[in-house]
Amino acid sequence: MQGSVTEFLRPRLVDIEQVNPTRAKVTLEPLERGFGHTLGNALRRILLSSMPGCAVTEVEIDGVLHEYSSKEGVQEDILEILLNLKGLAVVIEGKDEAMLTLSKSGAGPVTAADITHDGDVTIMNPEHVVCHLTGNNEISMRIRVERGRGYVPASARAQTEDDDRPIGRLLVDASFSPVARIAYNVEAARVEQRTDLDKLVIDMTTNGTLDPEEAIRRAATILAEQLDAFVELRDVTEPEQKEEKPEFDPILLRPVDDLELTVRSANCLKAEAIHYIGDLVQRTEVELLKTPNLGKKSLTEIKDVLASRGLSLGMRLENWPPASLVDDL
């Protein structure tokens, strides 16, 4: 096996064994030692709690006002019927909720196959028993199915609904997760000469609405998205300090000696208390010509030297001189 000793192996989806229509075993290998339990536990928790799915949330049964009652001609009490309805495995396509209806008469079992629905809904377990009728009795109900995630108890939804909720509309504890059971096992794996690797085997039982491979892919995507915040830590730095733009061009803060003028011109400027280039550029030609011993030749020299630095006489500088120069004087 080639590669750096610090390079981590990347697992691959090795096998999906379909044990029965609702149970499958998914195998991933090779994994670095210890990563079998690390990933197995994380994926197990996500698969149990975070897979989106559909569940029954409300039921209305003709002739029934509340869940703590029974219905004549029905073998089960209402609470047991609601519990059975929670076992429906439903898939909704293209929308977030659907209304199903169930009407049945005559003695015998009432199953999910007796439920009528539109083409956007598929019931994956039509053999699922809802209740049993006795004699020549009938039952009719309307069932609301919604898409969601996790577990939402009926009591939590009751607190958010208005007090005018119709009598007879029964709320159901909604378990949206399509994963009924999940377990994992870590076995030994080998790649060429390395025998200290892990093989992760995930044993998953669903309600038949979720493909095992798709379930693993969704769980891994959720895990990766949650970890992105840690990956992006390298991009989180202290707020960038904005560089304060200097109030004056640095060249204006330099002494006039840096202009390397002739001795005559330099002495004339010093006699007028012109110590910095910023002092000089604010003077006009007329003002400089009034300076003793500074003639047109010196003026021309000064203008040429300033021009070579992108400056000129007669410039206006707000707030000149800066405090730092005043302190130095």
Swiss-Prot record:
Coiled coil segments of this chain: none
**Among the entry's GO cellular component annotations, what is one?**
DNA-directed RNA polymerase complex
Say if the entry is tagged with keyword Ligase. Answer: no
**What SUPFAM superfamilies does this protein map onto?**
C-terminal domain of RNA polymerase alpha subunit, Insert subdomain of RNA polymerase alpha subunit, RBP11-like subunits of RNA polymerase
Return the similarity comment. Answer: Belongs to the RNA polymerase alpha chain family.
| NCBIfam families found in the cross-reference section | PRK05182.1-2, PRK05182.2-5, rpoA
* General function of this protein: DNA-dependent RNA polymerase catalyzes the transcription of DNA into RNA using the four ribonucleoside triphosphates as substrates.
Protein name stated in the entry: DNA-directed RNA polymerase subunit alpha
Q: Which organism is it from?
A: Shewanella violacea (strain JCM 10179 / CIP 106290 / LMG 19151 / DSS12)
Name of the gene encoding the protein in the UniProt record: rpoA
